[in-house]
Curated annotation (Swiss-Prot):
Belongs to the aconitase/IPM isomerase family. LeuC type 2 subfamily. InterPro entries: Acnase/IPM_dHydase_lsu_aba_1/3 (IPR015931), Acoase/IPM_deHydtase_lsu_aba (IPR001030), Aconitase_4Fe-4S_BS (IPR018136), Aconitase_4Fe-4S_dom (IPR036008), HAcnase/IPMdehydase_lsu_prok (IPR011826), IPM_dehydratase_rel_enz (IPR050067). It comes from the Archaea. It comes from Pyrococcus furiosus (strain ATCC 43587 / DSM 3638 / JCM 8422 / Vc1). HAMAP family: LeuC_type2. [4Fe-4S] cluster binds at residues 262, 320, 323. Its cofactor is [4Fe-4S] cluster. This is 3-isopropylmalate dehydratase large subunit 2. Heterodimer of LeuC and LeuD. It is an enzyme of class 4 (lyase).
Length: 380
């Protein structure tokens, strides 16, 4: 039996109705949820939280009015609203909201981030989340699982981003529709574990989860990844699975570097970038987005923020930043970006005529110094 089968109490392929231990949404999805909820329900019967993280503080009157609507709804239904403290997925972890929880639903596709904590976490659309708010439960089809066993330890330049990019390349031609990824023997810290599960939806997986002991029982596919044989990787435009070794695109001129997001905006990741930038000056626009206010505070307390500022980087208030192309750091026509985020589709960070490459924070920081995509091996 897979880990997810144990949590949901059934076999893959079965449909089950289960109570949801936690449901959450953000300022980008909540207006549609409110519209759907008000058509059918009058009372919230779920444990719910709302986070303002996508476009905050409000940059336009239209968005300010939408956020006011969310606040009014939350006040009526006594739902906590957390504003400007960071990205929802990160805050759920920091606030300990998954304690004593097994099933979590978020109104965001990267909700599987929380699978790093060993919970079944999935993203759903506005209508489904509205129903969960009204009923406190929903139906699930139990997904099949791919077991991924990590072996060895990575080199100093390889991070969790490289592991998940490698996995995306392995699963590129495999049908992951309604299948999950279960990771085992993971040697990373929590900061890096969250990157693994955050990124699995880019393989078209239903969710991801990290377990302790691999049994091999009930898995539709098994993969082993030798970490000590991995090198820094880059995803080329316009698909996160379009993965190549960094040396294949080395020398590509870039206009902007973004280090942050729900993928790589935690303290360990940003501090590694800061170590590289310390005492140097960036050659291109370099934007850093802490995943939470707690991360930002620690950056200040431990001197990480100072290193970044003195190197010429701009530190954003905690939130999604330019990742979704709506706020702070949007890119223009023909611009080339190296980003530590999880998506590089056309138009993701602004102009559909821009090109987005994805990498780990170490590669991004080194590239910011040279103004072009640079292999950290040999450069530092």
């Amino acid at each position: 039996m897979t880990l997810i089968e144990e949590i949901l109490g059934g076999k893959s392929g079965e449909s089950v109705v289960r109570r949801v231990d936690l449901v959450y949404a953000h300022d980008g999805t909540m207006p549609l949820i409110i519209e759907a909820f008000n058509k059918v329900f009058a009372t919230v019967r779920a444990r719910a939280y709302i986070f303002f993280d996508h476009v905050y503080p409000a940059p336009t009157v239209k968005i300010a009015n939408l956020q006011k609507e969310i606040r009014d709804f939350a006040k009526r239904h006594r739902i906590p609203v957390i504003e400007g403290q960071g990205i929802s997925h990160q805050l759920v972890v920091e606030m300990g909201l998954t304690e004593n929880s097994k099933i979590v639903v978020g109104a965001d596709s990267h909700t599987p981030t929380l699978g790093a904590l060993g919970v079944f976490a999935v993203g759903m659309g506005a209508t489904d989340v509205a129903v969960i708010l009204g009923l406190g439960k929903t139906w699930f089809r139990i997904p099949e699982s791919v077991g991924v066993i990590l072996e060895g330890n990575p080199s100093r330049y390889v991070m969790a981003t490289d592991v998940i990019l490698h996995l995306l390349s392995l699963l590129k031609d495999y049908d992951m529709n309604y299948r999950a990824v279960e990771f085992f023997n993971v040697p990373f810290s929590l900061d890096e574990r969250l990157t693994l599960t955050n990124f699995v939806v880019e393989a078209n997986a239903k969710t991801g989860i990290i377990g302790e002991e691999y049994t091999g029982d009930g898995y539709v596919k098994e993969l082993e990844i030798e970490l000590n044989s991995l090198n820094p990787l880059v995803a080329k435009p316009h698909n996160p699975a379009n993965v190549v070794p960094v040396e294949e695109v080395e020398g590509t001129k870039i206009d902007q570097v973004f280090i942050g997001s729900c993928t790589n905006g935690r303290f360990e990741q940003i501090s590694k970038a800061a170590e590289i930038l310390e005492g140097e000056k960036v050659a291109v626009r370099t934007i850093v987005g802490p995943a939470s206010m707690n991360v930002y505070k620690r950056m200040i307390e431990e001197g990480v923020a100072r290193k970044l500022i003195e190197a010429g980087a701009v530190i954003l208030p905690p939130g999604c930043g330019p990742c979704l192309g709506r706020h702070m750091g949007v890119v223009g026509d023909g611009e080339i970006v190296l980003s530590t985020t999880n998506r590089n589709f056309r138009g993701r960070m602004g102009s559909p005529n821009a090109q987005i490459y994805l990498s780990n924070p170490i590669t991004a920081a080194v590239s910011a110094l040279y103004g072009e995509i640079t292999n950290p091996e040999g450069a530092i």
